[in-house]
Regions:
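Multi-pass membrane proteins that catalyze or facilitate reactions on polyprenyl-/lipid-phosphate substrates
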Residues: 1-281
Length: 281
């Protein structure tokens, strides 16, 4: 893998993993365009590192909320003293607990990482990605256009968290966007767009980190991976940088708009994947 290819792939995935357009689908499409072998150990290690980089971007962006959630739950466990007298359950404590429960359905999904690898190494992968990108875009378009949610982030429920977490299992398939699916569920259940975007963003952190760790252990590149360490470091850094700034822009824009427009992006990527499939057939 060249430095140019690593730069393009890391930056693109750092952006598309944050947006509701399927980072895995874009990674495979761009790898095919750039001639990067997706079955090589270096590519699998690189994919893991850009996944970890995107997760790190989420930690950096949501660092205040993460610290508040961690602190309040440590207070609950008696490991920290409360800052002052508190009435009721602090919101950060409850949000942290909801985030924990939303992560539970992702555990079996991480074990299905091998399924994604087998799909990506098949002959009809581009066609599968094209179909799934269309489906992901269609769901997001319909739900975000029809939803009239009014509930803010303080009103999110355990059912919201569990449902949004469960639907993330489908994102193991390349072309199905984790963000699009979780946003669609949260919007469909009555959350306002800004609340859905924030909770989906927080949910992405353990999802990215967990997937990155599993993929890193699953990549069997040995010495080849060690020799490509500069590319892996570059991938981590670029995906983290791109992911952080994408989070800033995305959360600001979605405070005033609906995410339905990203469906057109997914459909455009689906057309490109289909063209590549037909050309290579």
């Amino acid at each position: 893998m060249s430095i140019f290819a690593a730069f393009i792939l890391a930056a693109a995935v750092g952006i598309t993993e944050i947006l509701p357009v399927s980072g895995s689908g874009h990674l495979y499409i761009l790898a095919k365009i750039l001639g990067v072998p997706v079955s090589s150990g270096v590519f699998l290690s690189f994919r893991a590192m850009i996944c970890l980089g995107t997760g790190f971007a989420g930690i950096l962006f949501y660092r205040t909320q993460i610290w508040d959630m961690l602190r309040e739950n440590l207070v609950l466990l008696g490991l920290l003293r409360p800052a002052g007298r508190q009435r009721g359950v602090p919101f950060a404590r409850r949000l942290g607990q909801l985030l924990f429960f939303s992560t539970l359905p992702m555990v079996p999904a991480l074990l299905l990482n091998g399924l994604r690898t087998r799909i990506e190494q098949g002959d009809g992968t581009l066609a599968i990605i094209a179909v799934l990108l269309c489906c992901s875009g269609a769901v997001l378009y319909y739900v975000s256009r029809s939803a009239r949610g009014k509930r803010n982030i303080h009103q999110i429920t355990l059912a919201d968290a569990l449902t949004a977490g469960a639907v993330q299992i489908l994102s193991v398939l390349p072309g199905l966007s984790r963000v699009a699916l979780s946003l669609s569920v949260l919007l469909g259940r009555g959350l306002e767009t800004s609340a859905a975007v924030e909770f989906a963003g927080l949910m992405g952190i353990p999802a990215f980190l967990g997937a990155g760790i599993v993929q890193l252990f699953g990549a069997s590149s040995g010495g080849e991976s060690f020799a490509s360490a500069p590319l892996l470091i570059l991938g981590f850094a670029l995906s983290a940088l791109a992911g952080y700034f994408t989070l800033r822009v995305f959360t600001e824009r979605m405070a005033e708009r609906k995410p339905s427009g990203f469906a057109y992006w997914s459909w455009g990527a689906a057309i490109l994947a289909l063209i590549l499939f037909l050309v290579s057939a």
